[in-house]
Amino acid sequence: MVFEKIKALIATQLSLDASTITLDTRFKEDLGLDSLDALELVMEVEKTFQINISDATLQNFKTVQDIVFYITKNTP
């Protein structure tokens, strides 16, 4: 469920086909995510899942799996 929501957020944010996004999709290398895109995506994730993601934590997100794992661990 978390993955599906994240996938939809990424697809909407970057105007992509959601079916191309997998857990192994890399933000920078595969999606071409720049710092502005990353900031906007994190703001949407924080709003959707009602969590706060620090800048330091954000720097650790390399793949979709990374953010899904973080959300799963840090939400009730």
From Swiss-Prot:
UniProt pathway: Lipid metabolism; fatty acid biosynthesis
One cellular component term from this protein's GO annotations in UniProt: membrane
Keyword line: Cytoplasm, Fatty acid biosynthesis, Fatty acid metabolism, Lipid biosynthesis, Lipid metabolism, Phosphopantetheine, Phosphoprotein
PTM annotation (O-(pantetheine 4'-phosphoryl)serine): residues: S35
Statement: the UniProt record of this protein carries the keyword Transport: no
Any one GO molecular function term: acyl carrier activity
Cited InterPro entries: ACP, ACP-like_sf, PP-bd_ACP, Ppantetheine_attach_site
PTM summary: 4'-phosphopantetheine is transferred from CoA to a specific serine of apo-ACP by AcpS. This modification is essential for activity because fatty acids are bound in thioester linkage to the sulfhydryl of the prosthetic group.
Source taxon at top rank: Bacteria
Main location: cytoplasm
GO biological process: lipid A biosynthetic process
SUPFAM superfamilies for this protein: ACP-like
UniProt-recorded name of the protein: Acyl carrier protein
Organism whose genome encodes this protein: Onion yellows phytoplasma (strain OY-M)
